Swiss-Prot record:
Species this protein is from: Pseudomonas syringae pv. syringae (strain B728a)
GO molecular function: FMN binding; L-lactate dehydrogenase activity
Gene name in the database record: lldD
Protein's name according to its UniProt entry: L-lactate dehydrogenase
An annotated GO BP: lactate metabolic process
Organism lineage: Bacteria, Pseudomonadati, Pseudomonadota, Gammaproteobacteria, Pseudomonadales
Keywords per UniProt: Cell inner membrane, Cell membrane, Flavoprotein, FMN, Membrane, Oxidoreductase
C-alpha cells in the first residue's frame, strides 16, 4: 500500500487491526458529530498564500516548557497503545526521541512508566487522570518522578467516561465482547502473532498491581469507570501542584473561564481539547474553542491544542489560531497500528514536510511568525 499522507495510515491500520481496536481509536461519543466537526472546522479555515517573501530558510524548531523541539508536535497519551503494535508505547517513545519531540505516556498504557522510560533515549511526559484512589495517583506521581518524567499532563475532562456506541458494536464492550474480540483477532493473523501472542503481557502496566488476579479488559475498564471522580474541584488538585515541581499541563479545556481558572491554579500550560470527540458529543470543535481561550489567557499560559489534526496544514492552522503546539493522537495510533515505530516516524516526516510547504507558501520562516495574519479570515 502506498503511504503518501497521514490519512493513508488510517486505511492501513483498518486493514491490519482487529475491528475492536480500530474502532476504539477511530470512533467518538454518541453520533460522533463533534468528532467530525473537529476535522471539518479545521479544513474550513483558509490559509493566506503569499509570494516573493524570501522563504529560503524555513525552520520548524521551537521551545516548549524548557525543551528544544524539532517541531511543535507532541505525541499524545493514547490508552492501550501497546495493543496496536508489540510493546507499542515503547515504539512510540523511540520514534519521538528519534524525531526530537515529546511523547506523553497514558495512565492506561500497556507498558509501564518504568518500561517506557528505560527504553527511550529522552525523558518522557506522563498523563494522569483524576481518580478517586488518591493513593494510586500519589504512587503514579512518585513513579513518574523516579523514572525521570519531565512534564505532567493532567486530564480533567473525564469525571465520567463518554458514551461510545461504536465500542458496543465492535466488541470493545457490550454483550459477548470477549469472544467477539477473539474471533476478530483470528481474521488478522499478522496482528494475532506479533501483538496478540508475542506482545504479551497485555495488562495495563501502571494499574495491574492494583487489580491482583483480575486481568481481563473488562476488569481494567471496570476499575477505571469506578475510579473516575465526578466530585473533583480545583481545590482538590492543590496537593498535586505542590507535589509536582516540574511543568504541569491541564488537558481538556474548552471554556475560557476554565482556562483562567487553570492559570489561577498555577498550571504551566493547558491543552484545548474535547478528547478527540470521545467525551461529550455536541461540544465545540477545538478549532472554534481555541481563539477565545487564547484571548482569555494571553501569553500568561502556554496553550496547546489537539483533536482533528490530520496533516501538517492542520498544525499550521492551529498555530495560526493561537496554539503554541499540538498533540497528535489518532494520527499516531493509525501509524503505529499500520507499521509500528517506522510508521510513526514516517508519519512525523509527512507532517514536517506539509508544515514546511504551508509555511513557505504563506510567507513565514519560523514557528514564531505563524499567527492569524496567515489566515484569510484575518484579512477579510
Amino acid at each position: 500500500m502506498i503511504i503518501s499522507s497521514a490519512s493513508d495510515y488510517r486505511a492501513a491500520a483498518k486493514r491490519k487491526l482487529p475491528r475492536f481496536l480500530f474502532d476504539y481509536i477511530d470512533g467518538g461519543a454518541y453520533a460522533e458529530h463533534t468528532l467530525r466537526a473537529n476535522g471539518s472546522d479545521l479544513a474550513d479555515i483558509s490559509l493566506r498564500q503569499r509570494v516573493l517573501k524570501n522563504v529560503d530558510n524555513v525552520s520548524l524548531e521551537t521551545r516548549l516548557f524548557g525543551e528544544s523541539l524539532a517541531m511543535p508536535i507532541i505525541l499524545s497519551p493514547v490508552g492501550l497503545s501497546g495493543m496496536y503494535a508489540r510493546r507499542g508505547e515503547v515504539q512510540v517513545a523511540r520514534a519521538a526521541a528519534n524525531k526530537r519531540i515529546p511523547f506523553c505516556l497514558s495512565t492506561v498504557s500497556v507498558c509501564s512508566i518504568e518500561e517506557v522510560a528505560s527504553q527511550s533515549d529522552q525523558a518522557i511526559w506522563f498523563q494522569l487522570y483524576v481518580l478517586k484512589d488518591r493513593g494510586f495517583m500519589k504512587n503514579a506521581l512518585e513513579r513518574a518522578k523516579a523514572a525521570g518524567v519531565t512534564t505532567l499532563v493532567f486530564t480533567v475532562d473525564m469525571p465520567t467516561p463518554g458514551a461510545r456506541y461504536r465500542d458496543a458494536h465492535s466488541g470493545m464492550s457490550g454483550p459477548y465482547a470477549a469472544p467477539r474480540r477473539i474471533l476478530q483477532a483470528m481474521t488478522k493473523p499478522d496482528w494475532a502473532l506479533n501483538v496478540g501472542l508475542l506482545g504479551r503481557p497485555h495488562d495495563l502496566g501502571n494499574i495491574s498491581r492494583y487489580l491482583g488476579k483480575a486481568t481481563t479488559l473488562e476488569d481494567y475498564v471496570g476499575w477505571l469507570a469506578n475510579n473516575f471522580d465526578p466530585s473533583i474541584s480545583w481545590k482538590d488538585l492543590e496537593w498535586i501542584r505542590e507535589f509536582w515541581q516540574g511543568p504541569m499541563i491541564i488537558k481538556g479545556i474548552l471554556d475560557p473561564q476554565d482556562a483562567r481558572d487553570a492559570l489561577s491554579f498555577g498550571a504551566d500550560g493547558i491543552v484545548v481539547s474535547n478528547h478527540g470527540g470521545r467525551q461529550l458529543d455536541g461540544v465545540l470543535s477545538t478549532a472554534k474553542a481555541l481563539p477565545p481561550i487564547v484571548q482569555a489567557v494571553g501569553s500568561d499560559l502556554t496553550v496547546l491544542a489537539d483533536s482533528g489534526i490530520r496533516s501538517g496544514l492542520d498544525v499550521v492552522r492551529m498555530l495560526a489560531l493561537g496554539a503554541k503546539g499540538v498533540l497528535l493522537g489518532r494520527s499516531m495510533a493509525y501509524a503505529l497500528g499500520a507499521d509500528g515505530q517506522r510508521g510513526v516516524e514516517n508519519m512525523l516526516d509527512i507532517f514536517a514536510r506539509e508544515m514546511h510547504v504551508a509555511m513557505t507558501l504563506t510567507g513565514v520562516t519560523s514557528i514564531e511568525q505563524i499567527d492569524a495574519s496567515i489566515l484569510v479570515k484575518a484579512v477579510a
